């Protein structure tokens, strides 16, 4: 079998700069790339600081169908599972930066869980 990995997952956004601000300022992700592709499209990659795994490709919606997916990209399921080496530090810092949480953190058999809202 070949050696494969997921390089990026697409996150459909309303506006590139608004999404970059959310991910880099609120979540403290790194902006890995922001390359214009044409007059309307950019190749924008973000990832958690220190990550060597999968990146998020921020893709601006360019059709009514894509616009309908903004804010509901996973049909109401959790979109992102973000692992950290210090849950409480990161959770408290995110709250300080204005990230809104759906509920208080809770302990599950697989770890501590906190559900937060993205910009949509």
What do these predicted ranges mean?
Residues 1-8, 30-85, 89-117:
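Vicinal oxygen chelate
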Residues 13-18:
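Short acidic-aromatic low-complexity motifs
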Residues 19-24, 94:
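Conserved active-site tyrosine of GNAT-family acetyltransferases
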């Amino acid at each position: 079998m070949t050696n494969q990995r997921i390089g990026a997952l697409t996150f459909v956004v309303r506006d590139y700069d608004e999404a970059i601000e959310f991910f880099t300022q609120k979540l403290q992700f790194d902006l890995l790339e922001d390359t214009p592709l044409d007059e309307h499209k950019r190749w924008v990659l973000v990832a958690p600081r220190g990550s060597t795994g999968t990146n998020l490709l921020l893709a601006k919606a360019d059709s009514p169908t894509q616009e309908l997916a903004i804010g509901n990209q996973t049909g109401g399921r959790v979109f992102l599972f973000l692992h950290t080496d210090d849950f409480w530090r990161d959770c408290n810092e995110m709250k300080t930066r204005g990230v809104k949480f759906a509920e208080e953190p809770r302990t599950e058999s697989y770890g501590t869980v906190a559900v937060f809202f993205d910009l949509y």
